Amino acid sequence: MKKAELLAPAGNMEKFKMALHYGADAVYLGGKMFNLRAGSNNFSDEELEEAVQYAHERGKRIYVTLNIIPHNDELETLPEYVKFLEKVGVDGVIVADLGVFQVVKENSNLNISISTQASNTNWRSVKMWKDMGAKRVVLAREISLEHIKEIREKVPDIELEVFVHGAMCMAISGRCLLSNYMTGRDANRGDCAQACRWKYSLVEETRPGETMPVYEDEHGTYIFNSKDLCTIEMIDKILDAGVDSLKIEGRMKGIYYVSNCVKVYKDALNSYYSGNFEYNPEWRTELESISNRSYTEGFYHGKAGVESLNYNNRNSYSQTHKLVAKIEKKLSDNEYLVAIRNKLFVGQEVQIVSPEIKVRDFIMPEMILLDKMGRETESVESANPNSFVKIKTDIPMDELDMLRIVL
């Protein structure tokens, strides 16, 4: 049986390595041009070469996003960049625009995935892309599980990729003009201002400046503000539909989000392919630990109703835990270099987060603060963000494991 791929976001090199450490089979990332995450750090050409080598040494894959909707003046440098991507050995590119698709076909033999931006919701469009030479189609988020099954039946010889977790867009597959209209920032060229998350009030034209409330609480009205997608409770049904890749959204999210999402969905995949799938409530508990706008299963059951919208404050993220540190390096059997992300105290109760679902409780031992040259300075009672400390403990940990606290 061919196993579905778990595809994780990587906004920079650190997130890339964390995604692989926690179990991703592949990552998708952007270079400095032609992708829809201008706010992400993204990868220079040198970093991209390094990432490809790092991934392939571990049997993992890399897909590069070329999913911008370009204007004429943005096409000039695309052919050379496509040739560069083929030269360094990326496993495929993700495109949304027919012109970009043609440039990739004319200048390389790269595998092409059709982006969710192309809004593929039916088997005819999927078959068209297959006939044109696409290897994979990332289906639109606005599609039901039953329609996915039908597409699989009618177009069996193309890979299907679906989103299983992350932020949802109120526009059709992200093709939104609100940001451009309101701020001049083009969402279709990587610069979305997330205007759908703003608070809106109703104004009647003969009463300028007099806003009228159309909400039931004090927060305002967030009529466009979607909850986040979470499909962990139906992941077996999605796999039964015959998809080839499960995609996690979030190139601009932090390492704790990426790592925890990956480990949860990887554990679910392993359970499914063991032949004895059983839903584990700890999966949902772990996903609640990361920052989220509350969860919905989106369009998988048909049209998404009001229950998929978040009517609370645009910043009403909820989470049960907070990242405080990352194991930067294992110095010896019981010594570790720790990168501090949030203030941390000696004697504080923390949890060790690793690729396994189970977390371990841990009391912070003595911390030796290091200076900018990496030299030991003094024992400290607390450590601040962006500092490094050395600790000793007999509790085994690995490089890239994380420490978190309960909120």
Residue ranges and their predicted role:
Residues M1-P9, M13-Y22, A26-L29, M33, ...:
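Surface-exposed amphipathic alpha-helical tracts and adjacent flexible/coil segments at the periphery
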Residues S40-D45, E76-V82:
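Glycine-rich loop at the start of a catalytic domain that most often binds anionic cofactors/ligands
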Residues I69-H71, V100, S119:
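A short acidic, glycine/proline-enriched capping/turn motif at secondary-structure boundaries
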